[in-house]
């Protein structure tokens, strides 16, 4: 399986905007922004959440929300406020909010077929 990145822009509450290269990870629920990014766009923590990593380790991180723009869609999304050396990750919750799915075989994003049930 390959590694796929997408270029996007994130915007905070004061309309500060930053371009960011996001790793698309369909196994991760929430989008994560590194500390340098979320501080630059003035995001503020809204709550604490506990997360379990793939190795079983539990970590606590603060969560906020931002406006995200990708080539195929844009909207508000929850984001984990990462630490200094964390990588920017695009998670499934954001993809679903934007109505997108990731095809890991073609390494592309495409519109999802939504069900109204």
Where are the regions that the model predicts?
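Pepsin/retropepsin-fold aspartyl endopeptidases
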Residues: 1-117
């Amino acid at each position: 399986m390959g590694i796929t990145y997408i270029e996007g822009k994130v915007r905070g509450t004061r309309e500060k905007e930053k371009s960011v290269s996001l790793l698309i990870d369909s196994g991760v629920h929430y989008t994560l922004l590194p500390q340098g990014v979320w501080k630059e766009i003035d995001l503020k923590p809204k709550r604490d959440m506990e997360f379990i990593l793939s190795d079983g380790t539990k970590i606590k991180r603060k969560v906020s929300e931002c406006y995200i723009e990708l080539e195929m869609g844009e909207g508000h999304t929850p984001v984990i406020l990462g630490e200094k050396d964390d990588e920017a990750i695009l998670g499934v919750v954001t993809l679903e909010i934007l109505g997108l799915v990731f095809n890991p075989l073609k390494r592309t994003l495409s519109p999802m077929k939504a069900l109204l049930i």
